[in-house]
Amino acid sequence: FDRMSKIGPCVSIFGSARTPEENPHYNLGVDLAEEPSKRGYGIISGGGPGIMEAANRGAQKGVGQSVGLNIDLPFEQNHNPYIDSAHNLEFDYFFVRKVIFVKYSQAFVALPGGFGTLDELFEALTLIQTNKIARRPVVLVGKDYWSGMTDWIQKTMLDAEQNISPSDLDLF
């Protein structure tokens, strides 16, 4: 907490570790991180490759703070070279890492990803929905990618089952 408290306002960017550099989503991740970084926001990613690397790369291009919240996994997750050395944090548990994502971010951006991306996204949405954290922007990038999920949320969770409120659709 002490290291993060010195960074200032941040934007968290979620996305797949498996996205290669030649994928258009990678370049979009770089661009999306660069803009808030130029405006003084730190960029927080999961610290790994793929979209996470793209986010940290964009943070460095924008000369902002580049933070990586790396998780110790038996496969796939090594920290990327675009994290500021003072802001490369290592975690053993996902729930602790998610606390840091949520506590220090003023906005959340989700690019295409897998189960980890969904876990981070729904953690943020749930905490906003239940007023455990203040309302802040949650942006889903890539309409084609997310439309199946957002349609399901509306048609199944809201319309068919009434498991969420109509206002919950305004969270993202």
Please place each PLM-identified region on the residue numbering.
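Short amphipathic alpha-helical segments
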Residues: 56-57, 80-81, 120-123, 151-153
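Glycine-rich beta-alpha loop segments
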Residues: 1-69
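Acidic/glycine-enriched connector segments
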Residues: 27, 50-110
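Residue-level signal for short, function-critical loop segments
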Residues: 17-19, 113-114, 144
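Short, solvent-exposed amphipathic alpha-helical segments in soluble enzyme
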Residues: 60, 123-128, 154-158
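Amphipathic, Lys/Arg-enriched alpha-helical "gate/interface" segment within cytosolic domains
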Residues: 4, 10, 72-85, 95-98, ...
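Alpha-helical elements of the RecA-like P-loop NTPase motor core of helicases
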Residues: 53, 119, 147
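Active-site/ligand-binding-proximal alpha/beta "capping" segment
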Residues: 92-141
